[in-house]
């Protein structure tokens, strides 16, 4: 495994939960505003 592949794997492991958390918070805010 090269350094670039290691970096990509690390980025995906780090980015996936961050993006999921941002999407979840946006959905929660949207649902709260709709009430």
Curated annotation (Swiss-Prot):
Alphabetic keyword roster: Cell inner membrane, Cell membrane, Membrane, Toxin-antitoxin system, Transmembrane, Transmembrane helix
This protein's record includes keyword Transmembrane: yes
Disulfide bonds listed in the record: none
A cellular-component GO term for this protein: plasma membrane
One Pfam family matching this protein: Ldr_toxin
Membrane topology: Single-pass membrane protein
InterPro entries tied to this protein: Toxin_Ldr (IPR025253)
Induction comment: Expression of the proteinaceous toxin is controlled by an antisense sRNA, in this case RdlD. Only a few of these TA systems have been mechanistically characterized; the mechanisms used to control expression of the toxin gene are not necessarily the same.
Membrane spanning residue stretches: 10-32
Chief site of localization: membrane
Annotated compartments: Cell inner membrane
Similarity section: Belongs to the Ldr toxic peptide family.
Biological function: Toxic component of a type I toxin-antitoxin (TA) system. Overexpression causes rapid cell killing and nucleoid condensation of the host cell. Overexpression induces stress-response and a number of membrane protein genes. May inhibit ATP synthesis due to its insertion in the cell inner membrane.
Protein name per UniProt: Small toxic polypeptide LdrD
């Amino acid at each position: 495994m090269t350094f670039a592949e290691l970096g990509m794997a690390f980025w995906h492991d780090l980015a996936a939960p961050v993006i999921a958390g941002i999407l979840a918070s946006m959905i929660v805010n949207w649902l709260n505003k709709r009430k």
